[in-house]
């Protein structure tokens, strides 16, 4: 076993990486409120795992979406638990993100030289809200349908580009299959990918600059 480790160590310098990860200085003023960002990340990972599990049963069509969600909740093994955890962790993720934003703002964590860390955090907040909007519609029940209709209709008030923007969001002139397909693609692929990229940027900046000091 040691020979295998030595082979990887010689090529990847695993010990140096481990030492760098475990040797970062943690300021004495850090308390439990500095864990809110990490809790948000944990909720996101739970979302990814449970969401991936549900893709095996969910059908993104206007005729089968609601029935597939019912199947997940009533017939699929542990489907009710997986979907419930997905919903609970979604609510927890939003709550932890809001508290994290307040903590960073109140402790001045957005100030120089951490402006870009703050910017990536704001982008992540927008992405998190987008998860809520797109995920809310996927069961394609009455609540989901009318929520999509209202949300996608908001840009229509914008002069000149309002109507084309609404049609872009809906995929057609009215809410239907194209809309559900777009929201499903956004919720399961585009938004998770963007979130993963910006989270990586966010954590690398924190890693480089360290935790902000007290007020």
Swiss-Prot record:
Pfam families: Cytochrome_B. Its cofactor is heme b; heme c. The keyword Methyltransferase does not apply. The chain crosses the membrane at residues 32-52, 90-110, 116-136, 186-206. GO terms for molecular function: electron transporter, transferring electrons within cytochrome b6/f complex of photosystem II activity; metal ion binding; oxidoreductase activity. Belongs to the cytochrome b family. PetB subfamily. Heme 1 (or BH or b566) is high-potential and absorbs at about 566 nm, and heme 2 (or BL or b562) is low-potential and absorbs at about 562 nm. This is Cytochrome b6. It comes from Eucalyptus globulus subsp. globulus.
